[in-house]
């Protein structure tokens, strides 16, 4: 009997393959930021979902978190362009963690779908090595929507799969345990 291979959060984040957006379930008492430890060389940017209730607020929060250039136009096309560029933020890959994601565009499913499409387009461009910055190589780009189990029920359709943040033992990796000195 062969062991079932389970994709860990770390191996998922290092991958330059879809899915580009995933739902990260945060347990009571946990902070989303504590669940995501970016692999070496990958940039982790935290976007506050509570600040993304309308498209205008979402654009402002992304501009703040990702330090968009002054020319950012605060519209969907400009967001898509900046997410596929990021030359001012050099890294081997990108992880966007949206905390309190149940608050992202809660009253407009059409705008929410547009937002997801833009994130997936950016992920695909980076994953195919077609993003700006002359990447020419597949680059990880993932967006984690962090919600509690209770908040998850607030949106009927998230449009993405859940990813497990629980530590998973990978085949061939031995965990170091602290030695006890007597």
Regions found by a protein language model. Name each.
Residues 46-49, 96-100, 144-146:
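Conserved beta-strand segments of the P-loop GTPase G domain that flank and frequently precede/overlap
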Residues 80-110:
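Short, structured protein-protein interaction patches enriched in aromatics and acidic/basic residues
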Residues 2-53, 134:
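N-terminal intrinsically disordered, cationic/polar leader segments
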Residues 48-52, 56-92:
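Conserved helix-adjacent loop modules within structured domains
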Residues 42, 92, 139-141:
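Short glycine-/polar-rich loops that comprise or flank the Walker A/P-loop
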Residues 104-168:
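Helix-rich interaction surfaces within compact, conserved domain-sized segments
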Residues 169-174:
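Acidic, His- and aromatic-enriched active-site or binding-groove loops in soluble protein domains
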Residues 160, 179-182:
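Mixed-charge, glycine-accented linear interaction segment located at domain edges/termini
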């Amino acid at each position: 009997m062969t062991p079932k291979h389970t994709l860990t959060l770390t191996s998922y984040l290092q991958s330059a393959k879809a899915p580009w957006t995933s739902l990260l379930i945060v347990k009571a008492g946990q902070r989303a930021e504590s669940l995501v430890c970016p692999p070496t060389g990958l940039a982790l940017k935290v976007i506050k979902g509570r600040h993304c209730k309308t498209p205008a607020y979402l654009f402002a929060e992304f501009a703040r978190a990702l330090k968009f250039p002054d020319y950012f136009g605060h519209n969907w096309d400009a967001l898509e362009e900046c997410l596929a560029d990021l030359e001012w933020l050099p890294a081997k890959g990108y992880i966007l963690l949206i905390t309190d994601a149940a608050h992202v565009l809660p009253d407009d499913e059409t705008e929410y779908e547009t937002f997801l499409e833009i994130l997936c387009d950016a992920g695909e461009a980076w994953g195919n090595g077609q993003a700006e910055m002359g990447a020419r190589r597949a680059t990880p780009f993932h967006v984690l929507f962090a919600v509690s189990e209770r908040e998850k029920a607030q949106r009927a359709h998230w449009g993405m799969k859940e990813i497990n943040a629980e530590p998973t033992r990978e085949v061939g990796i031995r965990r170091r345990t602290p030695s006890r000195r007597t």
